[in-house]
Design a protein with these regions (language model features):
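Short charge-dense sequence patches
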Residues: 3, 69-70
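Bacterial N-terminal signal peptides
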Residues: 9-19
Length: 159
């Protein structure tokens, strides 16, 4: 029996099914050690998809995944009660359709309950330590988060 996986993409570039003017371009950013990490996305209604891009000017470390500096597409895989963040190498119009073969990797997300339901999906980035941040995705009455840090190697004692 096949398991269906739903996803909320944060696709780089123009996604033909949404107009930036219709939903408004949104941006979340956080600065860690003078490096600004950004997620740019379009925020449609909570039952639609999120589109945007993930840019990091520094190497990052998520739980079990090192992400070299660069431009990526984020997809939130919402398979039942547990969500995963897929960091995908496809950008621009190539990112309009999710291709798991292009994943750099996936990280687990912690499910949390937002304080109140939202009408539009959104990403937030919040600094949690001098070189660490939390990425949160809120959509309708569900939310998930994962943390990351600047990747300074295995001897980094600031994490």
């Amino acid at each position: 029996m096949a398991i269906m996986t739903k996803y909320l993409p944060a696709c780089a570039g123009v996604l033909l099914s949404f107009s930036a003017a219709a939903y408004g371009q949104q941006m979340a950013s956080v600065t860690l050690d003078s490096k600004t990490i950004m997620v740019e996305y379009t925020a449609p209604a909570a039952n639609n998809r999120i589109s945007g891009s993930f840019h990091t000017p520094a190497d990052l470390a998520f739980k079990g995944l090192n992400v070299p500096k660069g431009l990526y597409t984020l997809y939130v895989l919402t398979d039942g009660p547990r969500w995963q963040l897929a960091i995908n190498k496809a950008t621009g119009q190539e990112a309009a359709t999710y291709d798991p073969k292009q994943d750099l990797g996936r990280v687990p997300m912690l499910m949390i309950r937002p304080p109140a339901p939202v009408s539009a999906c959104k990403f937030t980035l919040a600094k949690i330590a001098p070189i660490a941040a939390e990425l949160q995705v809120v959509c309708s009455d569900k939310a998930a988060s994962t943390s990351f840090r600047l990747d300074r190697g295995a001897n980094d004692s600031q994490w």
